[in-house]
Every structure is written in C-alpha cells, then in structure tokens.
C-alpha cells in the first residue's frame, strides 16, 4: 500500500513568492520603515518598481530595502547603507525569480 504522502513533492515557495508584488504600505510594514524612508531609498538606491498608479515592489526589491534598513539600524548613514546593501547584493548574487529589471 502506497502512503499518499509519498506522492507529494517539495514546494519551491521562493519561486512563488518571487512573483508576488508588494504595495508601499506592505513594504514599509515588512521592513519596519516609514513611507518617507522608502520614498527616499527608492530614488537614491534606484530600486525598481512596477505599477502605473501605485508603486509595487517585487521580493528582490523588498530584500534590497531590508538590507538598507539593516545597515541604517547598524548606524550607517543613508548613503553608506545604500552602498553597503549594493555591495552585499553584488557579493551574494543569485538567481532571483521574477525580479524586476533595473
């Protein structure tokens, strides 16, 4: 007798989440930042967004924002945080499904 659970296969959640788009409010909540911070970082760090009437961020962009927030929490200036996040992302480059092209 076959156990029905043997029919299941691993689920690649990262691929599915990569296709989800987040609103400004959702990104702020996830990253623990204000809309003003997100607006500034989006422009200064050239974080790509989608959406005509409302900015939307993919999981890759949210990761970028969270790295900047982490650096700010460590006491980095905004410019230093943006540079540190970019350097970290360059060192840890991986395939990011569904990422918005910059």
Q: Where in this protein do the model-derived segments appear?
A:
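Arg/Lys-rich, alpha-helical DNA-contact motif
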Residues: 1-29, 43-102
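Key DNA-contact positions within bacterial/archaeal DNA-binding proteins
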Residues: 36
């Amino acid at each position: 007798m076959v156990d029905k659970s043997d029919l299941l296969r691993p689920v690649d959640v990262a691929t599915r989440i990569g296709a989800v788009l987040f609103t400004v409010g959702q990104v702020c909540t996830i990253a623990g930042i204000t809309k003003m911070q997100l607006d500034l970082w989006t422009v200064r760090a050239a974080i790509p967004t989608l959406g005509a009437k409302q900015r939307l961020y993919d999981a890759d962009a949210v990761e970028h924002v969270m790295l900047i927030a982490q650096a700010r929490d460590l006491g980095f200036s905004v410019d230093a945080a943006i540079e540190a996040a970019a350097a970290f992302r360059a060192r840890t480059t991986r395939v990011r499904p569904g990422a918005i092209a910059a």
